[in-house]
């Protein structure tokens, strides 16, 4: 019996609950709840409160700065993109001024050219006759030089041809006279026909000379030579 009691006591002690605060009830009053305290001393509790407060405040500050910095970066990035797009779409002020100046110059250039072209045309039209009038006088000098050259060139062979014609006519006349005296009437008729051909040839030569040198007919020297040639041919015909 004694052993049974001792074993029951030893086994019953661990089964008992440790001393501590009573569990909260649904119907517990606020006064009873507020009167209870956290376990531990008051100093350790203050340190715990400080550590928790500092960590929470640091976390909040870090998150706040991170969010604000992210927003600022995004806003800066957006503004940079907007400025770049504006710069690409719109040229700077210096280029705008240059473009405006170039456009004004291009618009003024046709007007200036048109205004300058009209006086130039009006001035060139009256100047043209003056230039022609100034250049026209040398033409008579050239014309005078050309006839003089033609006269000189044509006058040189003229005396030789006239002399040859006169010599031929005199020879023909002497031969015909001698033949006429020696031969009979038939030969005289033949000689007369030959003289007619020579006479026809001599005026033909004179006509050819006149046609070849139209300018010589105007000069006095050419007229004298032609008169002498014609006189020689007439004398030959008269002798015949």
UniProtKB/Swiss-Prot annotation:
- Basic and acidic residues bias: start-end ranges: 73-87
Q: Name one GO biological process term.
A: axon development
Biased composition regions of type Low complexity, renumbered to the chain: 166-183, 228-240
Q: Which UniProt keywords apply?
A: Membrane, Mitochondrion, Mitochondrion inner membrane, Mitochondrion outer membrane, Transmembrane, Transmembrane helix
UniProt main location, coarse? mitochondrion
Annotated membrane topology: Single-pass type IV membrane protein
Question: Membrane spanning segments where?
Answer: 46-64
Q: Where in the cell is it found?
A: Mitochondrion; Mitochondrion outer membrane; Mitochondrion inner membrane
Q: One short Pfam family name for this protein? A: AIF-MLS
Disordered: annotated segments: 72-240
**Which sequence ranges are listed under topological domain Cytoplasmic?**
1-45
Q: Which GO terms describe its cellular component?
A: axon cytoplasm; mitochondrial inner membrane; mitochondrial outer membrane; mitochondrion
Which cysteines does the record link by disulfide bonds? none
Q: InterPro entries annotated for this entry?
A: MGARP, MGARP_N
Query: Please, which domain of life does this record's source organism belong to?
Result: Eukaryota
Stretches assigned to the Mitochondrial intermembrane side? 65-240
Function according to Swiss-Prot or TrEMBL = Plays a role in the trafficking of mitochondria along microtubules. Regulates the kinesin-mediated axonal transport of mitochondria to nerve terminals along microtubules during hypoxia. Participates in the translocation of TRAK2/GRIF1 from the cytoplasm to the mitochondrion. Also plays a role in steroidogenesis through maintenance of mitochondrial abundance and morphology. Plays an inhibitory role during neocortex development by regulating mitochondrial morphology, distribution and motility in neocortical neurons.
Q: How does it assemble?
A: Interacts with RHOT1/Miro-1, RHOT2/Miro-2, TRAK1/OIP106 and TRAK2/GRIF1.
In Swiss-Prot or TrEMBL terms, this protein is called Protein MGARP
**Gene designation:** MGARP
């Amino acid at each position: 019996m004694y052993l049974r009691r001792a074993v029951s006591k030893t086994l019953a002690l661990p089964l008992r609950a440790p001393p501590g605060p009573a569990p909260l009830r649904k119907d517990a009053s606020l006064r009873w709840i507020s009167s209870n305290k956290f376990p531990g001393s008051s100093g350790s509790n203050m340190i715990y409160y400080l550590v928790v407060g500092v960590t929470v405040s640091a976390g909040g500050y870090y998150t706040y700065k991170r969010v604000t910095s992210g927003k600022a970066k995004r806003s800066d990035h957006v503004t940079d993109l907007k400025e770049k797009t504006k710069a690409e779409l719109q040229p700077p002020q210096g280029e705008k001024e240059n473009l405006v100046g170039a456009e004004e110059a291009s618009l003024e250039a046709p007007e200036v050219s048109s205004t300058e072209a009209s006086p130039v045309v009006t001035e060139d039209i009256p100047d043209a006759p003056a230039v022609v009038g100034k250049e026209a006088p040398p033409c008579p000098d050239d014309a005078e030089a050309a006839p003089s050259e033609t006269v000189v060139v044509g006058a040189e062979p003229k005396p030789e041809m006239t002399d040859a014609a006169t010599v031929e006519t005199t020879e023909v006349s002497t031969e015909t006279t001698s033949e006429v005296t020696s031969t009979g009437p038939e030969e005289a008729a033949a000689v007369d026909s030959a003289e007619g051909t020579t006479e026809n040839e001599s005026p033909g030569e004179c006509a050819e000379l006149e046609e070849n040198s139209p300018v010589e007919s105007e000069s006095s020297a050419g007229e004298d030579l032609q008169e002498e040639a014609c006189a020689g041919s007439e004398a030959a015909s008269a002798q015949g």
